[in-house]
Regions:
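Perimembrane helix-loop-helix junctions
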Residues: 198-232
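Membrane-interface coil-to-helix junctions
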Residues: 19-117, 145-159
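Short hydrophobic alpha-helical segments that form membrane-spanning helices or hydrophobic packing faces
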Residues: 27-29, 201-203, 237
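Membrane-embedded helix bundles of polyisoprenyl
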Residues: 111, 115-124, 133-174, 179-211
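Periplasmic/ER-lumenal interhelical loops and adjacent helix-loop junctions
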Residues: 231, 235-265
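Start-transfer (signal-anchor) and selected internal transmembrane alpha helices
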Residues: 1-33, 222-231
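Alpha-helical membrane-inserting segments
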Residues: 91, 95, 121, 125, ...
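Structural signal for the C-terminal ends of transmembrane alpha-helices
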Residues: 23-28, 128, 170-176, 207-217, ...
């Protein structure tokens, strides 16, 4: 009973710290879902995120689901290229009849990132120390690490570094062949947040599976089958969310639009 109560207290502490961090980053007046002005101030990319979400929310449903053709110029676009947290964009668009016209979810995402950064770092440290106290103290260092703080308030999707901590926790605590479903779910989840994290997590998962194949004598057939399933599910997710809406030829063409400012007859 004591352990359960103590763990609940730790989670409550993490929630409180996460909320205080959120206030420090966005300000108490900007915590509300209705507050959007702060996203257009500063040198970060928050205005890009909010504009992408605004166009996406006010458009009809299309397929792929992440299609956002009204955001951009002269070629189709997708919510993923606005770095607007596709998983939340899709969720809140499905609720657009119930949310106000001026609406943002980025402060909520910061709160989630702060909490999960603390939560998973606590779990990892606890694995090695066995001490709740040391783990709580150690988790604070993950919260104030420069590589994390540098992304906060600059690139909201890249503040989701808890995804990497989750992957590290899985690698440390679960046998890779027994936790493959969790790994695949994590890979799919990361692709709905930012593809950079997907690349890193897929690399970690692949190395662990190769290690398991070589030293644990895992079946090669099972190895290939699992990777085929993972790849199929990942590419299906990428397609549905709209990662392939911009053609490679369009994105790489030289002198796009011939530098034009105005349409010339």
């Amino acid at each position: 009973m004591y352990k359960i109560l103590f763990k609940n207290r730790i989670n409550l502490l993490f929630l409180l710290i996460s909320f205080l961090c959120l206030i420090n980053v966005v300000g108490i007046d900007n915590v509300s879902f209705k507050s959007t002005e702060w996203l257009y101030i500063g040198a970060g990319e928050s205005s890009q995120h909010q504009l992408g979400w605004h166009f996406f929310k006010n458009d009809i449903w299309r397929f792929p689901l992440g299609s956002n053709p009204n955001y951009g110029d002269e070629f189709s676009n997708s919510i993923v290229f606005a770095d607007a947290i596709p998983i939340l964009a899709l969720f809140f668009k499905s609720l657009k009849s119930f949310i106000p016209g001026s609406f943002q979810y980025f402060s909520f995402w910061y709160f989630i990132c702060f909490f999960l950064q603390l939560f998973f770092s606590f779990k990892i440290i606890k694995k090695f120390t066995g001490s709740d106290l040391y783990s709580v103290i150690g988790s604070f260092f993950f919260l104030i690490s420069p590589i994390f703080l540098y992304r906060v308030d600059e690139h909201v999707a890249l503040a989701s570094q808890w995804l990497l901590l989750f992957a590290l926790y899985l690698g440390l605590t679960q046998k890779i062949d027994k936790a493959k479903l969790l790994w695949i779910l994590l890979i799919i989840l990361s692709s709905l947040i930012n593809l950079y994290f997907t690349a890193m997590i897929v690399t970690a998962y692949s190395l662990l599976r190769i290690f398991n194949l070589k030293f644990e004598k895992e079946s090669f057939y099972k190895f290939i089958k699992d990777f085929f399933i993972m790849t199929l599910l990942l590419f299906l997710t990428l397609y549905v969310v709209g990662y392939f809406e911009i053609r490679v030829a369009d994105s790489l063409s030289a002198a796009f639009g011939k530098y034009k400012l105005l349409e010339v007859a």
